[in-house]
Amino acid sequence: KYLTDGGLKKAIRLCKTIKADLVEEGKEIHLSSFDLASIMYHSNLDNLKKGKTYALAIVLETQRFFDYLYHNPNYRNGLYTPDWTRKIFDNPKKETSLTTMSVALDKLVTALREDLGYHYPNTLNLHPLTI
C-alpha cells in the first residue's frame, strides 16, 4: 500500500473486473489473476500513486500500460512474474488476451472521456501521467 497508496491494488481489481466482464460477454481471457497482478506490477507506479488525488489516474495508467505492452512486444515478452518463476506472456493465448483487454480498456477510457464532457480525442492527453 505504501508504495502506491493503494493504487496498484485498485489497478489489479480493475483488471479483474474487466476480465470478468469480458468472460461474461463470451470472450476467452487466458490471463490469471496472478498474471494480471504481475502485469500491473511492472506499470508506472508513480502514475498509480497519483490515483490517491486523481481518481482517473488508475484507469488511465492501466489503459496506457496495456496499450504500451500491445505495441512493444519485445518489452512485453521479457516481463517476468514478481517472484521470477516464469515469464508472464509464456503462450500466444495470453498475448491475444492482452489485446482483448487493451481494447476493452480503450473503450472504457473513451466512454469516461465522453461522460466527462471531453468530446475531442486530444483533450484527455492533458492528464498528469508520465511514460
Name each model feature, range by range.
Residues 131:
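Acidic, metal-dependent phosphodiester-chemistry machinery of nucleic-acid enzymes
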